[in-house]
Amino acid sequence: MDFDEFYRDTSRRLLRYAYGLTGDPVEAQDLVQEAYARAWQRRRRLAGYDEPEAWLRLVVNRLAADRWRRLGVRRSRAAAAGPPDPVAPPSENVVLLVRAMRELPVTHRRALALHYLLDRSVAEIAAETGVATGTVKSWLSRGRAALAAELSKGNNEPEGAGHVR
């Protein structure tokens, strides 16, 4: 496996996945960078895997979970402050969506990110997460319902926006 080519082919998808999990572009970049550093160290073994990109997503998922446990209160404060402005700001809809996704349980957020951001099927998500397809369908259904509820709340509007009554 040519690692440079593997990186070029997978890095954008992996970054989208990490951003979907964290809601923070800087944290997402850190997770992806660490995942590729680990992949580089294991590149010979990784070349033998059927799905090396799935291994990378698993590493990102575990790194994110580790950081959430370690950061605790600091992460809550950072999330309340919102993500830093990226070079090319995301659309208003993306900001609202990510803000709402932060409120979801991690299982729902992960399933939604895999399904909608990485176009993974229910069967692929089930295989990657080690659960039954029915569980994935439940996560997606509950995640969509919770996401709809979050998006319908007034507190997900951009600053300065208000309701006209």
Regions found by a protein language model. Name each.
Residues M1-R16, V26-Q29, W40, R109:
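A short, charge-rich alpha-helical start-of-domain segment used by transcription regulators
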Residues D2, E128, A145-R165:
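C-terminal edge and immediately downstream basic/flexible tail or linker adjoining helix-turn-helix-like DNA-binding
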Residues S11, L15, Y36, P105, ...:
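C-terminal flanking helix
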Residues R16, D30-A37, Q41, D50-R62:
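Structural recognition of an alpha-helix C-terminal capping motif at a helix-to-coil junction
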Residues Q41-G48, L58-A79, P90, K153:
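Arg/Lys-rich amphipathic alpha helix in sigma70-family domain 2
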Residues N61, A65, T129-K153:
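DNA-recognition helix of helix-turn-helix
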Residues D66, R74-M101, S121, N156-V164:
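Internal acidic/polar
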Residues A111-H115:
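A short pre-motif secondary-structure segment
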